[in-house]
Amino acid sequence: MAHRPTVLSAFMSTPSPALSDFDARLHRFRQHLADTLVPLWQGPGWNADMALPYEALDAEHRPLPVVRYRAMACARQLYLFSSRLEQPGAAERAATLFRSLRTHFHDAEHGGWFHSIDAHGQPLDRRKDLYTHAFIVFACAHYWGQVGERLVASTLEGALSVVAERFARDDGLYEASLGEDWSDLGSGPLQNPQMHLAEAFLQTLAVRADEAVQRALTGLCEALQRDFVDPDTGVMLERPRGAADNWFEPGHQFEWFFLLDTSPLLRDTPLHASIARGFAHAEHVGVQDGAVLAMLGVDGQVIDATQRIWAQAEYVRALALRPAWRETLARQLQVLETRFLTAEGWHECRDGAGRVSRHDMPSTTPYHLATCLAGLQE
């Protein structure tokens, strides 16, 4: 496949020469999100009949054949548009996404939200998973902080109650997946849903005081330190410590570092100290020639050398937290721009040799780019 022009090729207005190279790249990143990426989901990426975003677009901006719509994808897009309510059409789109989250995915019989619906709007995967519910809490908390509407507040409250009453275990952790009727599927806890639940709790605390959420968050972090952190390296493992064939993902180390380091509540906790060590280890063994690798074994051996745009964005966001990392940050922002962003959108993945290995653009990715940009601007 012919190499598509990157953002550097032009297709965007050029910032003032007075800006530093870093500021110029940041300007282009901000402009690319606003002028190219967000409009994809206002135009070709939007199914007006379903009032939902398509799951993904191809490189020519055509929707992929519809197999499903996920509640998590709807919630991520709600965050995206509620983050830019001042932009034309964003407030209306956020309101529509919020309505769709409630009408398409909510389980009126058992409570909670289905994982996905089919092309006709009928429940597809009827299980209740923590990852989905964490993003519903996150998106509703953020949206409520923007609009202050009573229905948004009640939806947030309902989602928090479901998490506390259905997913919570007696060890401070949360089940990854439950049946439609909340039956036990034996999933146990997994790292990624716990991380996004922590993110959702932090977003809730950013918009309101909530002692129950604060207790749940600190308890979750204590349990993760106990059961998921590798004591030798400080990295957060994907499965509980001692699980067979365990691994870690450098992108998640960088994502965790940002969440903990930016929280006055969680900064300087034992988990923060571990993840700071884990960051250094992940950077040493999991970043090669500027590319964040997908998966490594506990021993540091590469399992999957795929380079994913979300992991690159999380690395950039984390690097912005330390003035001493400014030079590395500038290099990594360049990597994000030149290897992943294109005039038409973005490359989702490259393989270990640097070749584009995934040619579609999922509706869930702009969430990572928007949170990365927000972190850089803050």
Residue ranges of model-derived segments:
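Glycan-recognition and catalytic cores of secretory/periplasmic carbohydrate-active enzymes
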Residues: 4-378
